[in-house]
Each structure stands twice: as structure tokens, then as C-alpha cells.
Amino acid sequence: MKKLLLFLFAYITLVGCESKTDSSCGQAFIGGEIVNPVNDFLVLYDDTSPIDTLYLDQENRFSYHIETLSPGLHSFIHGGEYHVIILEPNDSIMLRLNTLDFDESLVFTGRGSKKNNYLINLYNTLDAEDKIVYEVSKYEPVKFLTVIDSLQTEKIEDLNRFKVKYESSALFNKVALASINYSYSTHKELYPFRYFGRHEIKNRTGLPSNFYDYRADIDYNDDVLKDFYPYYNFLFPHFNNLALDRYFELTKDSVFDRNSIVYNMNKLDLMNEMVKNDDIKNNLLKYATRNFLSYNNSDADCDAMYESYQSKSTNAEHSEYITSLYNTIKKLRPGNKFPDIEVTNYKNEVTNIDAMFNKPTVIYFWSHAIKEIGRASCRERV
């Protein structure tokens, strides 16, 4: 009976919107089932703003009717796993996933499902291809470029076949093409670091003259993609690359030092100069600064990076986060007392972390979202 009511509600939502145009309807439905749920809810987001918490029923199903939809990229999070979907007016989407194999098991049905199934299949294909591309990065530049361009062309041709077979919106076309192009452009930005290494990257000789031609089409202020991970996965190594020339000019170093304060402050300067969209710029500044503070052992360098960040960021929440991180890291220097942090032990008792230890102790941490965090952090730092 619950299944019947759920699908009946989806149908009513869909039919209720049929008489309106896509631009004026502004409604959508999303529901589905989570197999082996980690907890009893998922959170639905519009950009980075939470829309609502959707609770699972006794059969691990959920349903949600969006009365006023802002068409675009949305996302949901369950148990630390994160996925992006496209929601547009009149969409009535059901999803099913198994947390034991999150992305690989995710499938959509209903109106609006084809575009989202295409995107999850593309994501899984590109993700599996990463290992191949890493090996291809050992090839000399011309051969590497030939392979990468061939893979990119293959994906674009597949997208074109999809668009011929199914009606698609301008939003889907933009997001799908961006997923392809930015993914392969990311590999090109990472290539010099992988192929030349820190000892030879200063010269970077042998790159074909057309190697960076795609840079002419970069939109540093794409509001539609401002919360889309392939876009950021590209921008981080892109600015890493752009900062190299200034770094070598100013330091005269012969060997690349990724933790150099000169190099990292150059990155902040470039982000501040080239990106005008505040949301995008603030995110780039935040994560670049976070990574530097987390891996640098010099108080003077951390002070300089922190001051540079504060002079550029316009996001108060980000600024508060970076300030907290900065102060915490300074307290973690050898000889200082452990920061005042409350933790929960295995008995579900809350205690101060400093009160737990009375002898030399090794402390380690992990995250439910370690897969995605590790991947993003690695790309940011390469």
C-alpha cells in the first residue's frame, strides 16, 4: 500500500505540472529507497544550502515534494556519501541505491531519470578511467595528449548520441559537457606534475604548442557550476599550474617545493585576480589556505598565509573556519597543550580530549567520507 501511495503521489505531482511550462511550473518530486542505510535520513541540498532532511520510513523509503524548485544542480548526502543530481520543473524522480556500493548501485527511474542515469554512468566511467590515465601520464607529451583527446572525443560522441535519442535541456547539455571537458582538462593540468616531477617541472619542455588550448574556453565565474565537483577538481590543479611560473621567477629555486610560502601565496593572488564570482573565489581561497596551514610547520609562513587569506576572502563563515583552524594548528605545535576539544568515547560519554591522556599517546582520526575527501585533497595538492 505504501508503494502504491508513493507512486500515486509522484504521478499526481507530475500530472499537476503538465499543464504548465517548464519555466513556470517550479515543482518537482524526489523519492526512493536506500538499501543498507547508514542512518534513517538523507539531506537534500540546493547548491550548498540544505533544503530539508528526508527521513526513511520502516521500509527505508522516502519521498519529498518540492513546491518551489530552483532548477539546477542539487545534491543529497547519506552517511557521509555525496551525490549530485539535476532537478528541473516537472521532474518526478525515484532513486535506489545500496550503501555497500554507493555510486555503482545508484539508479534513477521516472521523469528526469535518463539525464541523471547518464550523469552517474559518466561519473563511474570517468572514475574507473582515472587509473588508466595515471599510467598514461607516464607517456611522453605528444602520445599522452593523443590518448587523452581520443578518450574525450569518445565521451562527447556518446553524449551527442544521447541527445539525439532523448530530449535534453540546455542545463543538462551544459552540465554533461562540462563533466567531460573539465575532467580531461584536469588530467592535462596534472600531467606536468606527474610526468616531469618536482625536479624537472621548472623546465616543462616538450609540451606541444596546443597542449593548453582548452584554457581559452575556461569560465572562471560559472555560476551554474559553482558547486559542481568536476569544476573544482579542475580549478585547483589549474591554479597550481598557473602559480608555477611566478614561483620560479621569484625564488630562483631549481627544485619545486609545493609547501613554499611564495608558491602558495601566488596561488591566492591568482585566484583573487582571475575569479570574480565571490562564491567560487571564496571556496578556492578557503581550500587552498586550509591545505597549506594543514601541511606547513612554519609559524611565520602560516601567519603570512593566514593574513593573505583574510585580506581576500569575503565569506564570514569561511573566515571563521580558517581562523579556528589557524589557531588550532598553532596550539598543536610541539610543547603546547592539546586544544580544548570535546569528544565522545565508545561508551557514548562526552569528555575533554585533554583529560583522556596521562602518558605519551598516539592519536589518529578517520572520516566516514574519507574516500571523497581523500580524492579531493589529493587533487588539490598535486
What does each of the following model-derived ranges do?
Residues 318-354:
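N-terminal "domain-start" segment that seeds a small globular fold
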Residues 380-382:
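Positively charged, low-complexity/disordered segments
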Residues 18-172, 190, 195, 199:
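A non-transmembrane, solvent-exposed segment enriched in polar/low-complexity residues
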Residues 349-377:
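Short active-site neighborhood of thiol/selenol oxidoreductases, capturing the structured segment around
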Residues 13-16:
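C-terminal motif of bacterial Sec signal peptides marking the signal peptidase cleavage site
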